[in-house]
Amino acid sequence: MTNQQKLTISDIAKLANVSIATVSRYLNGQLNQMSEATAQKIKKIITETDYIRNSAAVQLAKKRSNLVAVVASNIDEYFSSEYFKGIVSILSAFGYIGVLLDSDSNLKTEKAHLESVYNQNFAGIILQPLTTDSAVIRKFLNHNMPIVLIDRELADLEMSSVTTNNFEIAKYAMAQLAPDSFSNVTVITEPVKKISTRVTRVAGIKTVFDQVNVIETRSEHFDVNQLATTVDLNNPQNLLVVLKERLLIQLLTHPSFLMQAHQTQNITGFIDTTMPRYLAPNFKFIQQSPYLMGASAAEILIKHLSSANNDYQQNIQNIIIPSHYK
């Protein structure tokens, strides 16, 4: 097999300077959803690179269920909706349908969804787990159901995953903020527990700041007024680092923030969309790429579904999609 034949949809999209979704539509014959010039450009690149669509995966889709379960920790989060779009853009190109199941930040709900997926005829699963109990996931592996984790890692299980560079980018961003300028550092996050994403972000922050106050809350219960009673939001020496965009937006839209002059940045965090940049155009944030993470997770799953003799566990992939502080 040549290098050209190993190209993915993501590669074709980059070469054509279009979105993954646009390439997916082209492959599905949905030419009415793009300009003729775009269609011709994609066609030219596919011809020049000898790109071969994974026909084995397409044939598999005809022989088994074409449903893929996508179990999200909470679809109210911008991150979840963005990565689901990325997942669907790839699955649809191979004849699969993504079925979104919302755990709603509730372990019992997640467990019920996983039981349902296990007992139903799903081709595979892409999971953003709340649980850190590897036994819950292991039975899928034992049943040989293809599974890919997104935004999470489980250290004691060997399985495919797509994450971002949480530790490295958190450490880098903190170093860029002139640490000596701050006397107090407060991290605002949903409950950390043992969730790998949150644990590694906090660890990255603590490599730069020795003393860090971690406030755990839930997006739907976050009260900025209550936070203001313990943290002086107007004091430029107080740094706030928010690990979820939804929490960050609640801070950026609060009157106490809107009334500040913002000569010095004292709020930053992880973001998934451009909204925080409109609210604080002079601030830098840690920009994730959830759409690309979702598309990458779907591509891995398609490869697993195409594995000879369903022996996908011999082809484990752990992909890191870098986030950027900008």
Located regions from the model:
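N-terminal helix-turn-helix DNA-binding module of bacterial transcription factors
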Residues: 1-65
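Short beta-strand segments enriched in small/hydrophobic residues
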Residues: 20-24, 60-75, 184-191
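Amphipathic helical "hinge" segments at domain boundaries
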Residues: 52-114, 121
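Short, solvent-exposed amphipathic alpha-helices that sit
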Residues: 78-93, 169-172, 196-211, 250-254, ...
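Flexible loop/hinge segments that line or gate small-molecule binding clefts
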Residues: 128-171, 271-283
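Hydrophobic alpha-helical segments within soluble ligand-binding/sensing domains
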Residues: 162-187, 223-229, 288-308
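An alpha-beta-alpha
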Residues: 173-213, 309-326
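Flexible loop/turn connectors
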Residues: 232-240, 246-326
